[in-house]
């Protein structure tokens, strides 16, 4: 039996782009055959709905409301709901897993972190970082930043992406040798279509979010749940935006992204 989990989902309580409260997703994911979801609302520097002028405790309380709404409904129905978030830097976004509300309350400096600080502090606390939809080109980003040394995995299939962006992400992940994930990037329970959802599959159910973190960090075997097959990159499709290949300090290396993609040159961490 396959246990399918959603890894990328937004609620209207915390994400400005979210269209549904957390509780509305539960029965729909049960009906779609999922075994659990991870709520990953947009955090401070992303498309967050919460007033950033609030005191830190109030900000975090409100930020976690969508997750808590989903969790409470999930508990009523015996459906696991785990916590995460999505943070933005310069259009490049990262899914954070394995930490909780209490931890966030102890870190009011989070909005000032660099990519490097985020990675090092999250890892030291027992969490992990996955770069979301790395080749996405939207009106909110003008450059693609590839942070291979400052993440633990790559979201290679995002249901909100153009197919070429996902193909580029898979090629990139194979070159750098990081675990790959998939997610729906779901924003609305009312319009979600089961045959378009994505996620990850395990042979055994996840007991908690740490099980997912361990699977990524320890490179345990799990598969991707995809609505369509992810075709390989054909060598000719280029990113839609200028790319910056960042080093372990978060600085631009000046490397040619297309050369790396075509030659398959491994990157040093």
Predicted regions and their residues:
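Generic beta-sheet signal
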Residues: 84, 132, 183-184
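Short, flexible loop segments at the rims of nucleotide/cofactor-binding pockets, characterized by
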Residues: 13-16, 59, 105-109, 131-134, ...
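C-terminal active-site-proximal or functional interface alpha/beta core segments in diverse enzymes
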Residues: 60-64, 104, 108-120
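Charged catalytic cores and adjacent phosphate/nucleic-acid-binding surfaces used
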Residues: 1-7, 11, 21-27, 91-102, ...
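An N-terminally biased module of ancient metal coordination in phosphate/nucleic-acid-related enzymes
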Residues: 1-88, 148-149, 163, 188-190, ...
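Conserved beta-strand positions in the central sheet of alpha/beta enzyme cores
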Residues: 38-39, 130-131, 155
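Surface-exposed amphipathic alpha-helices with a cationic face
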Residues: 4, 30, 71-75, 116-130, ...
């Amino acid at each position: 039996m396959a246990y399918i989990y959603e890894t990328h989902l937004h609620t209207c309580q915390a994400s400005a782009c979210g269209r549904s409260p957390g509780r509305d997703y539960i029965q729909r994911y049960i009906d779609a055959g999922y075994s659990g979801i991870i709520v990953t609302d947009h955090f401070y520097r992303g498309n967050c709905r919460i007033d950033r002028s609030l005191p830190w405790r109030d900000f975090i309380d409100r930020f976690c409301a969508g997750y808590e709404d989903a969790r409470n409904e999930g508990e009523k129905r015996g459906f696991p709901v785990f916590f995460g978030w999505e943070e933005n830097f310069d259009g490049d976004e990262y899914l954070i897993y394995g930490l909780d509300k209490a931890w966030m309350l102890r870190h009011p400096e989070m909005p000032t972190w660099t990519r490097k600080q985020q990675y090092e502090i999250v890892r030291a606390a027992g969490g992990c970082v996955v770069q979301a939809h790395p080749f996405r080109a939207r009106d909110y980003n003008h450059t693609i930043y590839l942070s291979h040394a400052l993440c633990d995995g790559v979201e290679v299939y995002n249901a909100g992406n153009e197919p070429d962006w996902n193909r580029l992400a898979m090629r990139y992940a194979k070159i750098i040798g990081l675990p790959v994930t998939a997610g729906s990037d779901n924003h609305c329970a009312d319009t979600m279509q089961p045959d378009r959802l994505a996620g990850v599959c395990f042979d055994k159910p996840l007991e908690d979010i740490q099980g997912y973190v361990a699977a990524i960090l320890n490179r345990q075997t799990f598969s991707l749940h995809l609505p369509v097959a992810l075709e390989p990159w054909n060598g000719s499709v280029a990113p839609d935006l200028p790319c910056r290949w960042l080093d372990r300090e978060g600085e631009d290396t000046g490397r040619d992204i297309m050369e790396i993609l075509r030659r398959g040159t491994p990157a040093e961490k």
